[in-house]
Curated annotation (Swiss-Prot):
GO terms for molecular function: 5'-deoxynucleotidase activity; GMP 5'-nucleotidase activity; metal ion binding; nucleotide binding. Keywords: Cobalt, Cytoplasm, Hydrolase, Magnesium, Manganese, Metal-binding, Nucleotide-binding. It holds the Pfam family SurE. This is 5'-nucleotidase SurE 1. Homodimer. A divalent metal cation binds at D8, D9, S39, N93. PANTHER family: 5'-NUCLEOTIDASE SURE, PHOSPHATASE, PUTATIVE (AFU_ORTHOLOGUE AFUA_4G01070)-RELATED. Binds 1 divalent metal cation per subunit. Most active with Co(2+), and may utilize Mg(2+) or Mn(2+), though with less activity. It comes from Pyrobaculum aerophilum (strain ATCC 51768 / DSM 7523 / JCM 9630 / CIP 104966 / NBRC 100827 / IM2). Transmembrane segments: none annotated. It catalyses: a ribonucleoside 5'-phosphate + H2O = a ribonucleoside + phosphate; a 2'-deoxyribonucleoside 5'-phosphate + H2O = a 2'-deoxyribonucleoside + phosphate; GMP + H2O = guanosine + phosphate; AMP + H2O = adenosine + phosphate.
Amino acid sequence: MKILVTNDDGVHSPGLRLLYQFALSLGDVDVVAPESPKSATGLGITLHKPLRMYEVDLCGFRAIATSGTPSDTVYLATFGLGRKYDIVLSGINLGDNTSLQVILSSGTLGAAFQAALLGIPALAYSAYLENWNELLNNKEAVEIMGAVVSSTASYVLKNGMPQGVDVISVNFPRRLGRGVRAKLVKAAKLRYAQQVVERVDPRGVRYYWLYGRDLAPEPETDVYVVLKEGGIAITPLTLNLNAVDAHREVDMDSLNRMVEYINASL
């Protein structure tokens, strides 16, 4: 099996290294990722300037860094390098990607959506963390995360993406320990109340920061499962944004079997 691993936190992110290590048992792995953090770039691609690719040594394995966005990396790996992939794994993102509000701007999900547009099964992984030390200093948590990545990816490689699903988003809670369970849930609409802060620089020119304040999570959504229940949210997503053709058959049996398969690995 040919696997592409990418992310939006940049080629030097510990999360990318973890995802690469977790994927090694599944097949032949290529790592192609942005040279620097490209968070919140969504499905954006680079059309206004040329793109560069170059090899980097990441403490024992080689990766290809690109000057583009996460979405660009999928294009470059597929068409620039001429590779044919069986699956694309994006992440592991530092910070959760829960709610449609976040999903639609996420570079992690953007890479997965780009893969899906090219007909490649794709999974995106994100963790509700403030820094990587929270995870890397916890061997049990790393093992659980590895089991989830391995089980989700191997399920899709063996069975294909469930009918009606284009991308699967996996969000890990802050604390991963024995007893944690995966749960199949929809994405909430909102994660944050959007706000803008206006400030003035030393030259008297105004500038602005965009940020968000946490909203109360809606029950039975990805936000609620990760933030309130401390579970692993498994959220199936579709590329179909057509309101006229919104109805789409989804193979819930396959999705439920996937979650059972994940939980059996924990």
